[in-house]
């Protein structure tokens, strides 16, 4: 079985190639991908060559961990059947070539993939491109959920993650948070909350500040906005060291928490919120390109400040 996939052969060396898939094992399903998302966190690090080494890392690789598509092959014991609409967080299903392995890191940017059935999530057939956003929505939910976690009253950044954090806060019954955004064009599409220029905000009593900007240089300024005993949650992805001045944080008795990737229970809860209508995925995708233009799409996703979320459309790809 063959597929057309995005292959990142090295830093900034990206294009489409036809490659071989591993044959499905018992318990696997085969999914025809219609849409995949481009992450400006981990994928950008692979693309630029800045990803710190970890076991299993290497080029060439198939990037991506956000994909939506339809099941085309499934045994009855998998719980799926052909035609089911699913979200898949990628797969490592690519057969090695004579030159060596092709790594699935994380393997979602492909026309077709093979995955263990338990990794796929059945979604509403009405979710087209938005179906690829489930991982990001579940990541936002993971940052908010948990014992003793305080819902944000300030969110920094009105990108895709910031919007999801704000929407989920309201869906959880919290007060509408204040959202900071320095770019005027990104202050649009607020749904039930206020987005402001941080320069106009004089508050110094925020109990819980969620940073969704990924800017490691903001911590000191955020500490000054905390109430005593308040918390800063690092919900973004940081490519440079995060540091802060100790004395102001000491005076505020500030707490710092890092939110990582989603877990299965986050995905279950997020899907339920979407299906019930409590969480909207509208106005999050700003750019869509056919998969045949993958090289241009990745360059735009990582360089255009107006691009909140880029989606590759695989439907016309053979």
From Swiss-Prot:
Enzyme class: oxidoreductase
Domain of life: Bacteria
GO biological process: light-independent bacteriochlorophyll biosynthetic process; photosynthesis
CDD domains membership: 2-desacetyl-2-hydroxyethyl_bacteriochlorophyllide_like (cd08255)
SUPFAM superfamilies assigned: GroES-like (SSF50129), NAD(P)-binding Rossmann-fold domains (SSF51735)
Pfam families: ADH_N (PF08240)
Enzyme nomenclature, EC number: 1.-.-.-
Keyword rRNA processing part of the UniProt annotation: no
Pathway: Porphyrin-containing compound metabolism; bacteriochlorophyll biosynthesis (light-independent)
Family matches, as InterPro entries: ADH-like_N (IPR013154), BchC (IPR005903), GroES-like_sf (IPR011032), NAD(P)-bd_dom_sf (IPR036291)
Function: This protein catalyzes the penultimate step in bacteriochlorophyll a biosynthesis.
Name of protein: 2-desacetyl-2-hydroxyethyl bacteriochlorophyllide A dehydrogenase
Organism of origin: Cereibacter sphaeroides (strain ATCC 17023 / DSM 158 / JCM 6121 / CCUG 31486 / LMG 2827 / NBRC 12203 / NCIMB 8253 / ATH 2.4.1.) (Rhodobacter sphaeroides)
């Amino acid at each position: 079985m063959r597929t057309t996939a995005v292959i990142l052969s090295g830093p900034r060396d990206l294009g489409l190639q036809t490659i071989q898939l591993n044959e499905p094992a018992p318990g696997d399903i085969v999914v025809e991908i219609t849409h995949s998302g481009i992450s400006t966190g981990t994928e950008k690090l692979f693309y630029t060559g800045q990803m710190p080494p970890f076991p299993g890392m290497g080029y060439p690789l198939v990037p991506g961990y956000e994909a939506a598509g339809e099941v085309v092959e499934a045994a009855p014991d998998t719980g799926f059947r052909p035609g089911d609409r699913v979200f898949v967080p990628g797969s490592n299903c690519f057969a090695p070539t004579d030159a060596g392995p092709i790594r699935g890191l994380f393997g979602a940017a492909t026309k077709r993939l093979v995955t263990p059935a338990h990794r796929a999530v059945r979604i509403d057939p009405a979710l087209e491109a938005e179906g690829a956003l489930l991982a990001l929505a579940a990541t936002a939910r993971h940052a908010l959920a948990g014992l003793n976690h305080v819902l944000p009253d300030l969110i920094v950044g009105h990108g895709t993650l910031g919007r999801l954090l704000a929407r989920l806060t309201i869906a959880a019954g919290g007060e509408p948070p204040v959202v900071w955004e320095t770019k005027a064009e990104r202050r649009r599409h607020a749904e039930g909350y206020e987005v402001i220029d941080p320069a106009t905000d004089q508050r110094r009593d925020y109990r819980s500040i969620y940073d969704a900007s990924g800017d490691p240089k903001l911590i000191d300024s955020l500490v000054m906005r905390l109430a005593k005993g308040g918390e800063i949650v690092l919900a973004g992805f940081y490519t440079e060291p995060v540091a802060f001045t100790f004395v102001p944080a000491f005076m505020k008795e500030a707490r710092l928490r890092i939110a990582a990737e989603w877990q299965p229970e986050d995905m279950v809860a997020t899907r339920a919120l979407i299906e019930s209508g409590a969480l909207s995925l509208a106005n999050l995708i700003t750019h869509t390109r056919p998969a045949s233009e993958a090289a241009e799409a990745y360059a735009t996703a990582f360089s255009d400040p107006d691009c909140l979320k880029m989606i590759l459309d695989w439907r016309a790809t053979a």
